């Protein structure tokens, strides 16, 4: 069985987790999320590379650089979820299976957050489970990749 490399992208303002609106996003920091993902990745015999940026272009460049390097992407694009056609197009261009995750349930929040440009090019979307959304996203992408491998 192939060991998969998964890119985890955290978008704008996620570097403030633990301080920013804990009533919505919880008290866990981004470093703690990354540690949890690294530990879960070891259990699944995969590797994760975590990148956070507040800049759309850096996120896009990182997606482009993932081509041929990573077999899956987990992305929490933050507010770019609802605004960035460019991130959507980058994900579509590289054709790397992607799971979109959100800490909060975006459909229980402001109406403008109900639309995702990423969802149509992702294999799935997980939201509303706090830090668990990331863990579920990792489990989902690994299961998807293993099924894909077994079907070939």
From Swiss-Prot:
| Family membership | Belongs to the type-II 3-dehydroquinase family.
Database matches in CDD domains: DHQase_II
Q: Where is this site: Transition state stabilizer?
A: 20
Name it: 3-dehydroquinate dehydratase
Q: Which GO terms describe its molecular function?
A: 3-dehydroquinate dehydratase activity
UniProt pathway annotation? Metabolic intermediate biosynthesis; chorismate biosynthesis; chorismate from D-erythrose 4-phosphate and phosphoenolpyruvate: step 3/7
State the function annotated in the UniProt record. Catalyzes a trans-dehydration via an enolate intermediate.
Any one biological process term the GO annotation gives: aromatic amino acid family biosynthetic process
| Positions that bind substrate | 76, 82, 89, 103-104, 113
Q: Which residues cross the membrane?
A: none
Q: Which UniProt keywords apply?
A: Amino-acid biosynthesis, Aromatic amino acid biosynthesis, Lyase
Q: Do you know which InterPro entries this protein is assigned to?
A: DHquinase_II (IPR001874), DHquinase_II_CS (IPR018509), DHquinase_II_sf (IPR036441)
- E.C. number: 4.2.1.10
- HAMAP family tied to this protein: AroQ
Q: How does it assemble?
A: Homododecamer.
Known catalytic reactions: 3-dehydroquinate = 3-dehydroshikimate + H2O
Kindly give the Pfam families that the UniProt entry links to this protein: DHquinase_II
Catalytic residue list: 25, 102
């Amino acid at each position: 069985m192939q060991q998969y490399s998964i890119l985890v992208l955290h978008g704008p303002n996620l570097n403030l987790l633990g301080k920013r609106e804990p009533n919505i996003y919880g008290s866990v920091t981004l470093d703690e999320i990354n540690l949890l993902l690294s530990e879960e990745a070891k259990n699944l015999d995969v590797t994760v590379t975590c990148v956070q940026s507040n800049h759309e272009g850096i996120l896009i460049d990182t997606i482009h650089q993932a081509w041929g390097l990573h077999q899956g992407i987990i992305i929490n694009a933050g507010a770019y979820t609802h605004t960035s056609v460019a991130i959507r197009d980058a994900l579509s261009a590289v054709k790397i299976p992607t799971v979109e995750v959100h800490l909060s349930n975006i459909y229980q929040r402001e109406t403008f957050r109900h639309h995702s440009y990423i969802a149509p090019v992702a294999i799935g979307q997980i939201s509303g489970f706090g830090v668990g959304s990331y863990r579920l996203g990792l489990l989902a992408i690994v299961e998807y990749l293993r099924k894909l491998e077994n079907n070939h």
